A protein has these predicted regions:
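Charge-dense, helix-prone N-terminal extensions
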Residues: 1-109
Length: 109
């Protein structure tokens, strides 16, 4: 994990850090060469000109990935923001297989 992102996460509760790292690991499982860095103080994961952002809050994480909208019908148990970000709250399971698909599609299109 990027040291800059690690430092940024220190301001959040352990539960959010744990959730963040679980989601982040799914990004790295795409097996593409990820460049992780903070962009506008937001953890961002780049491959070529594609990006995924994980935005932590006190009780959830917003995921910004361009392919989320393609799978909205499979994400009805989760909230999508008006900007198309997926919100994963602490009390929800991570839809790992679906996120793997979304992340790979986002990064390789």
């Amino acid at each position: 994990m990027n040291q800059e992102i690690n430092e940024y996460l220190k301001n959040y509760p352990l539960e959010i850090i744990t959730l963040f790292k679980e989601i982040e690991s799914l990004i790295y499982q795409t097996n593409v060469s990820i460049d992780a860095k903070l962009w506008a103080k937001l953890p961002s994961y780049y491959y070529n000109d594609q990006v995924i952002r994980l935005i932590p809050f006190k009780d959830h994480i917003n995921i910004e990935a361009s392919s989320i909208i393609n799978y909205k019908d499979l994400l009805t148990d989760y909230k999508l923001t008006p900007k198309g970000m997926l919100q994963i709250f602490l009390d929800k399971n991570i839809p790992s297989e679906l996120l793997n698909t979304i992340f790979l599609e986002t990064l390789t299109k």
